[in-house]
């Protein structure tokens, strides 16, 4: 929800007129609403799957973006509707027979892999995605979510903060 990947994901979905359900801690609720979340689930104090069922009238969600870990991906896959899909950047969920009954699709996202793949088509696709995202930022449809501007010498501290996976928005280093 409140992290960089989730924040961009929410905004892109809203730019495509999707209904967005996200999870975050209570302290970040207003922040994610400002980014476009229609429904916010406090993952620390609410049962995420129960809330998804409540919000979707028992149907489940069409799509899940999992950017945290395998446990979150496993929870996300349970919240999908029949024919839904999950995109994961931080570990794939466990696939069981029950999962296959839902006819879901699972996508492992490795954007950085395009750079090391020596696959020109993958690199071109990544460049086109970046170009489209930048157009959305320039047009004001997507916020760059810069929440912290740090100096070059503070990059190690910024990276330590990112490792906690509790950074809101994006940390940007100012290089003079």
Where do the protein language model's features map onto the residues?
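C-terminal substrate-binding/catalytic core of Rossmann-like NAD(P)-dependent dehydrogenases/reductases
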Residues: 98-148
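Glycine-rich cofactor phosphate-binding loops and adjacent beta1-alpha1 units
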Residues: 40-109
């Amino acid at each position: 929800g409140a992290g960089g990947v989730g924040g961009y994901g929410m905004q892109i979905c809203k730019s495509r007129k999707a209904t967005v359900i996200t999870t975050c801690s209570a302290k970040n609720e207003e922040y994610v609403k400002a980014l476009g979340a229609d429904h916010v689930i406090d993952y620390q104090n609410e049962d995420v799957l129960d809330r998804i069922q409540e919000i979707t009238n028992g149907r489940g969600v069409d799509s899940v973006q999992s950017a945290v870990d395998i446990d979150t991906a496993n929870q996300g896959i349970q919240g999908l509707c029949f024919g839904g899909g999950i995109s994961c950047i931080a570990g794939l969920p466990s696939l069981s027979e029950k999962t296959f009954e839902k006819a879901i699709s699972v996508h492992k996202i490795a954007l950085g892999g395009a750079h090391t793949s020596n696959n020109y088509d993958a690199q071109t696709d990544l460049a086109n995605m970046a170009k489209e995202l930048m157009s959305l930022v320039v047009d004001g449809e997507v916020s760059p979510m810069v929440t912290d501007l740090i100096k070059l010498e503070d990059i190690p501290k910024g990276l330590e903060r990112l490792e906690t996976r509790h950074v809101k928005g994006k940390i940007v280093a100012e290089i003079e």
